[in-house]
Structures are given as structure tokens and as C-alpha cells.
């Protein structure tokens, strides 16, 4: 699907990466935003502890955003709102925040989910900020918000291993690799 994704500019299969920041490993999963890929979305949402809702500063909430956010809120996931592309020009911040709040209300967000933090960003320029008035110099404000707003994973480290595999990859040196979330127990290197 990579060729189709590049050609159409959409995400079909989830992409997973990890960032080590301030002593914490943050796993980030880019999931399809469209209902046509609902199976992929549901599979991935079972692995995450919270979601980042990316909103285009100029275009606002996209129609495909509704599907994924509705699923995430229905599963009780906490959302962190990232207003991206704030470098592209003027936009009405108040109107955009109202649009986001209406979306959360329409989708049945509970009180905890409705109390979401907003981060302003320019992914293209590589910065994030907690206020629109100042441009950041890096993505630290976004990563700090992830650590403070998204709940840490829960699980029983002492129980038998329970691993939810969500993706299978291949490496020519290692072979097949199962990528997933450890719900119980632990895995040792070696």
C-alpha cells in the first residue's frame, strides 16, 4: 500500500515509531483517518493509551477526523489536540477552538475527554508551542504534553506474557518481527 499511500497522500496502513524523551519511551502510531480503513483503525486503537487529534489550522476538522475520534472517545481514550500548520497564514483561533469543542460534544466526549489540552505546531518547520503567540524552537512542548496528558500504560508485570500483535514487519537480518503491546508480563532481550 506504500505506493498507493504516496500517490493519494493518505494513510492506509498504520505506521509505528518510538521516541525516547526525558527517560520515557513514547510510541507513536499514525493511523488511517478514513472510515474505509476502519478495521485498521480499531486494531490500532486497542493498542494506544491516548490519541493526538491533528487539526489543520486553515481547513479545520476534516470529515475523516470524525470517524477515528468517535472510535477513540468511545473506547475512553484521552485526546490531546494539536493544531498544525499554524505557520501557513492567519486563521480564526476562537472559531477553530469552537469547531473542535462542538466536534467533541457531538461525538459524546465525557467530562474528562472534553477537558483537552491544545498544542500549536508547525510540523513542517519542526516546532510546537503551548500558545499561539509564540513559536517554539522544537517539539518539546508537544512531547511534554504527551507525557502530562496521555495516561501511562497499565499492566501486570508479574503475570504471564500477554502480547497483542498489531503489525508484522520483516527485516533481512532478523526475519519476521511482531510489533505489539505487552498487556501483561514482560519480555527480556536476549
Region locations from a protein language model:
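Structural and coupling elements of P-loop NTPases
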Residues: 1-190
Amino acid at each position: 500500500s506504500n505506493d498507493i499511500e504516496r500517490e493519494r497522500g493518505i494513510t492506509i496502513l498504520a505506521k509505528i515509531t518510538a521516541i525516547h524523551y526525558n527517560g520515557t519511551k513514547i510510541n507513536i502510531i499514525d493511523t488511517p483517518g478514513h472510515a474505509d480503513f476502519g478495521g485498521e483503525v480499531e486494531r490500532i486503537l486497542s493498542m494506544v493509551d491516548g490519541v493526538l487529534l491533528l487539526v489543520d489550522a486553515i481547513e479545520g476538522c476534516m470529515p475523516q477526523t470524525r470517524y477515528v475520534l468517535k472510535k477513540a472517545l468511545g473506547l475512553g481514550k484521552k485526546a490531546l489536540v494539536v493544531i498544525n500548520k499554524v505557520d501557513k497564514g492567519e486563521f480564526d483561533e476562537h472559531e477553530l477552538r469552537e469547531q473542535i469543542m462542538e466536534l467533541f460534544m457531538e461525538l459524546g466526549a465525557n467530562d474528562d475527554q472534553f477537558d483537552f489540552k491544545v498544542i500549536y505546531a508547525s510540523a513542517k518547520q519542526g516546532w510546537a508551542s503551548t500558545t499561539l503567540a509564540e513559536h517554539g524552537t522544537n517539539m518539546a512542548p508537544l512531547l511534554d504534553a504527551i507525557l502530562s496528558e496521555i495516561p501511562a500504560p497499565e499492566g501486570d508485570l508479574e503475570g504471564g506474557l500477554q502480547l497483542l500483535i498489531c503489525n508484522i514487519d520483516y527485516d533481512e537480518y532478523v526475519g519476521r518481527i511482531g510489533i505489539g503491546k505487552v498487556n501483561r508480563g514482560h519480555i527480556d532481550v536476549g
